[in-house]
A protein has these predicted regions:
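Alpha-helical interface subdomain recognition
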Residues: 1-82, 102-107, 114-119, 219-362
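Short, flexible active-site-proximal loops enriched in glycine and acidic residues
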Residues: 82-92, 206-207
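N-terminal glycine-rich flavin-associated loop
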Residues: 87-106
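Short beta-strand-to-turn element immediately C-terminal to the catalytic PLP-Schiff-base lysine
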Residues: 100-103, 163-166, 172-175, 198-200, ...
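A short, Trp-centered hydrophobic/proline-enriched beta-strand micro-motif
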Residues: 117-129
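A short core secondary-structure module
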Residues: 125, 148-180
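Cytochrome P450 C-terminal beta-domain/meander region
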Residues: 132-146
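Flexible, small-/acidic-enriched active-site or ligand-binding loops
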Residues: 133-136, 151-152, 175-209
Length: 362
């Protein structure tokens, strides 16, 4: 039985990659990360939403394309390969799914149509449910929320945020609320935005079907983890390709370094370890929609395993490049940092493996 991306999924992924090659080459990524040039980021985001990235998972009745998570995983892989400096996993995957699975009919009609028309953009922060840190605690009292949310993703130009408490209740807050303060967090990955949000008596719209029901938030987190895994696979593949290309050109001791057995073995090991990761993340994405009883475990396994494999690829790829691997001239560090940040978002490999063990009754 053949299991892989369909012709349509590959075509869409190729279009995303081509757009990024044309509109967001490495020099543009450098400019964005060095100058925090949001105008260029907005142009890139607008171009990708013109391709339909904002509407991938939205049901057709709300103006979306009605596609499945495997389609989104193919897109995420393409975005990772280009270290795309835009919001995707949070804004256009997790947020729509949170509303689809946790919102009332009225909330779906209100927000999903606006996501489809690109008139609202969500940042999302669920760290309180995944594993609260320090004093980052959100307390809901009626329709008011107080506290602090850490590691909110896709916050650039967000008009709204979806947050949660430690019980899994998700709620929407307006980014313009006078009691809400957004503090940008320092991160090694400058291609995306990570913030801390302070809330002081902020008005919250609770997603109706998430009260005393963890199904919606768990599905939202599962989807996010699969997207991050796919993004890392795309980034790691680029690092391997660059390593092989460099090994064929770089000469040392009168011969190309790719002729040395040690370098050959590093490239072969990276490829052998990464290749199965495609099937792992594709299967997890497929199960999300079609075998839901297995989806949560597979999301944990794909996120944890791929985080480890891509970390190894990032390390060995840098070693193949030698000292040049650390320079900005080649820009390898953008993919390195992307992989490193994906590894920690929505749960480290250790935390996610612990969740997988609990799911299996260990």
């Amino acid at each position: 039985m053949y299991f892989g991306l369909s012709e349509e999924q590959t075509f869409f992924q190729d279009n995303v990659k081509k757009f990024l090659d044309d509109q967001a080459p490495l020099d543009v990524i450098r400019q964005i990360t060095a100058e925090k040039n949001t105008s260029i980021q907005e142009e890139i985001r607008q171009g990708l939403t013109n391709l339909g990235l904002n509407a991938l998972l939205l049901p057709e009745e709300y103006g979306g394309l009605g596609l499945d998570l495997l389609f989104a995983a193919a897109v995420s892989e393409g975005l990772g390969s280009g270290v795309a400096p835009i919001a995707f996993s949070g804004s256009y995957v997790m947020a729509p799914l949170a509303i689809i699975h946790g919102g009332s009919d009225a909330q779906k009609e209100n927000y999903l149509t606006k996501i489809a028309s690109n008139t609202v953009k969500f940042g999302i922060g669920l760290s309180e449910y995944i594993g609260a840190r320090e004093d980052a605690k959100l307390i809901i009292n009626g329709n008011k929320v107080n506290g602090k949310a850490l590691f909110v993703i896709d916050a650039d130009d967000a008009s709204h945020f979806i947050l949660s408490d430690d019980q899994g209740t998700m709620f929407i807050v307006d980014a313009d609320d006078s009691g809400l303060e957004v503090i940008e967090l320092t991160s090694v990955d400058k291609t995306r935005s990570y913030v801390e949000i302070l809330l002081n008596n902020v008005t919250a719209e609770i997603l109706d079907n998430t009260v005393k029901n963890n199904n919606a938030i768990e599905k939202t987190i599962d989807a996010g983890r699969i997207m991050l895994a796919a993004d890392s696979v795309g980034a790691a593949q680029v690092m391997i390709d660059k390593s092989v290309e460099y090994a064929k050109e770089r000469k040392q001791f009168g011969r190309v370094i790719g002729s040395f057995q040690a370098v050959k073995h590093m490239c072969a090991e990276m490829t052998a370890e990464l290749e199965p990761c495609y099937a792992i993340v594709w299967h997890a994405a497929h199960c999300f929609d079609y075998i839901p009883e297995e989806a949560r475990l597979l999301a944990c396994q794909s996120k944890s395993h791929i985080s480890e494999v891509t970390k190894m690829v990032a390390k060995k790829s840098t070693e193949v490049h030698g000292g040049m691997g650390f320079t900005d001239l080649l820009g390898l560090h953008y993919w390195f940092k992307r992989i490193g940040m994906n590894r920690q978002l929505l749960g480290s490999p250790e935390l996610v493996r612990d969740e997988a063990g609990k799911i299996q009754g260990f």
